[in-house]
Amino acid sequence: MCAMDRRERALISQLHFTHSLGEAISFLKYPVCVRFEDGSFIKENNCFEKLIRSSFNSCDEWFDSLKLECKLQLSRAEIESCSSIYGVNCNNDILLNNVLWSVIIESVITPCGYFFIWRFIWVANDNLSSFVVSKYSNELIVPSDEYVGIEPYLIGFSHHYSSAKMNITVSKSKKKTMKLFKRYGFSSRDLWLDEMIRTEKILPLYAKVKEILGR
């Protein structure tokens, strides 16, 4: 068999990432969509489809229907999220379908390019809006030192494969993993992954592993 070229590997890598991203946002109870750096919308959850996209056939069609000022504001927010220390930009009082929303845009850089996660929080729900803005101002955007050396294992690879990629011993990989799980109260990797996917903390970690594997 012929070895895949870099373009083919990048395409497969992007497909895996977008699939994981789609699964992660499907758990959320507020509208979320994902746009790639080329301006195309690649994912949305059910809440977005029902509350934001509504009668339009696609996210792109919905976005094209917005007023120019609104489109520029949201596109500019993507750019500003890239330069933000937390990778997040928040726009308040965006009027969509006669409802005011806070739109929180988070940028995630991967070897394939930038992905932008758009979160829509109903302004009338002050408690939820404040919680989400606070969460994405303080939550982990880049994996902490606690993950260094065991990143591949944390997202699903075996200790043997992970330790070989990270150039550490299997024993050290297991000890560091046990220490991390014990500190945060996880009895298994399954429970760890369940929590990470539901809270979307898996996304920056996944991007980090993609970077490691691409070296």
Curated annotation (Swiss-Prot):
The keyword Transmembrane does not apply. This is Protein TraJ. This protein is essential for positively regulating the expression of transfer genes that are involved in the conjugal transfer of DNA between bacterial cells. One of its GO terms (cellular component) is cytoplasm. It comes from Escherichia coli. Gene3D superfamilies: PAS domain. Keywords: Activator, Conjugation, Cytoplasm, Plasmid, Transcription, Transcription regulation. It is found in: Cytoplasm. The gene is traJ. The keyword Cytoplasm applies. InterPro entries: TraJ. Its main location: cytoplasm.
